[in-house]
Curated annotation (Swiss-Prot):
This is Pantothenate synthetase. The lineage of its organism: Bacteria, Bacillati, Bacillota, Clostridia, Thermoanaerobacterales. GO terms for molecular function: ATP binding; pantoate-beta-alanine ligase activity. It catalyses: (R)-pantoate + beta-alanine + ATP = (R)-pantothenate + AMP + diphosphate + H(+). Its EC number is 6.3.2.1. Disulfide bonds: none annotated. The gene is panC. The active site is at residue 37. The reaction proceeds by a bi uni uni bi ping pong mechanism.
Length: 283
C-alpha cells in the first residue's frame, strides 16, 4: 500500500496508473474509519482497478464552535484497516499541504440544496465540503468516487457540483451502514457515553416510524414532520436540530409527498449532533 502526504508525488503515482489504463476509484474520508467507510472501500474495490483513500479532517467545513479540534483521529489504526482491505494508496495531507499560504479560492454550490437542513444549521459547511472535494478530484483525478448515503445532502450537493462543472468523475452512492440496533455508523458516535449511545437509537426509530406512517398512507409532509418530532421528544436526552421531508435529489419542499423523497434528521444526543435519513419512494 502506497502512502502519500504530499500532492506532487501522489499525482505522479496516479499518472502512472492511468498510463497503464487502470480505472481509479476514490474514497474521500476524514479518517477515524468505521465499517461505513470500509463498505465504501469494498464497493470501490469491486468497481475500480486502483483504490485511493484520502484521510483529511478538512478545517474549511467546520464552523467556529464546532468539533474540529476534538474530531477523533487515529492514522495508525486507519492505515492498518485500509491495508487489511487491500487499498492501493492512501493520501493523508496536512492542512498546510492542502491550503497553501494565501489560499483564497472557494467552490460554492448555491440554491436551496445548500441552504436547508445541515446548510442552515452549519453555515459555510458545504462551501468547505465543495472546495475540498473539488481539490481532491483535481489531485486524484478519479474515474469513480464513492460517497455514503448517510450524508445524503452532501451526496446530492456533490452530484450537482459534478454536473454543473462538468467534472470528469462518476459519483457512486453507497447505502448507510448501521449498527445492530439501527444507529447509523459515524465517527462521532465515539463521543457518546453508554446512556447517550442507547438514546441515540431514537434517530433510526424515528425514521422507521416515519416510514410506517408513509406506508400507512400519510402524504402531508408537515404532518409527517410533526409526528416524527413528537416521537423524538419521547427521548429525554434528544434535542432536535431539524426534521425535514423533501424531494430527492434537489431537496425542495413538497406540498404533498410523492415520487422520491427524503426524511432527514439532525438530533443532538447530549452535546453530540447526529444525522440520519431514509430515502423513500411512493407513487
Amino acid at each position: 500500500m502506497r502512502f502519500f502526504t504530499e500532492i506532487k508525488p501522489l499525482k505522479t503515482y496516479v499518472a502512472e496508473q492511468k498510463r497503464e489504463g487502470k480505472i481509479i476509484g476514490f474514497v474521500p474520508t476524514m479518517g477515524y474509519l468505521h465499517d461505513g467507510h470500509l463498505s465504501l472501500v469494498r464497493k470501490a474495490k469491486l468497481q475500480a482497478d486502483v483504490v485511493i483513500v484520502s484521510i483529511f479532517v478538512n478545517p474549511l467545513q467546520f464552523g467556529p464552535n464546532e468539533d474540529f479540534a476534538k474530531y477523533p483521529r487515529d492514522l495508525e489504526r486507519d492505515l492498518a484497516l485500509l491495508q487489511e482491505e487491500g487499498v492501493d494508496c492512501v493520501f493523508a495531507p496536512s492542512a498546510e499541504e492542502m491550503y497553501k499560504e494565501g489560499f483564497s479560492t472557494f467552490v460554492e454550490v448555491n440554491g436551496e440544496i445548500t441552504e436547508v437542513m445541515c446548510g442552515k444549521s452549519r453555515p459555510g459547511h458545504f462551501k468547505g465540503v465543495a472546495t475540498v472535494v473539488t481539490k481532491l478530484f483535481n489531485i486524484v483525478t478519479p474515474d469513480l468516487a464513492f460517497f455514503g448515503q448517510k450524508d445524503a445532502q452532501q451526496l446530492f450537493i456533490i452530484e450537482k457540483l459534478v454536473r454543473d462543472l462538468n467534472l470528469n468523475v462518476e459519483i457512486v452512492s453507497v447505502p448507510t451502514r448501521r449498527e445492530e440496533d439501527g444507529l447509523a455508523m459515524s465517527s462521532r458516535n465515539t463521543y457518546l457515553n453508554p446512556e447517550e449511545r442507547k438514546a441515540a437509537t431514537i434517530l433510526y426509530r424515528a425514521l422507521k416510524r416515519g416510514e410506517e406512517l408513509v406506508l400507512a398512507g400519510e402524504r402531508n409532509p408537515e404532518r409527517l414532520k410533526k409526528l416524527i418530532e413528537e416521537f423524538i421528544k419521547t427521548e429525554p436526552l434528544a434535542r432536535i436540530d431539524y426534521v425535514e421531508v423533501r424531494s430527492v435529489p434537489d431537496l425542495k419542499a413538497m406540498d404533498v409527498i410523492k415520487g422520491k423523497f427524503i426524511i432527514a434528521l439532525a438530533v443532538y444526543i447530549g452535546s453530540t449532533r447526529l444525522i440520519d435519513n431514509f430515502i423513500l419512494e411512493v407513487d
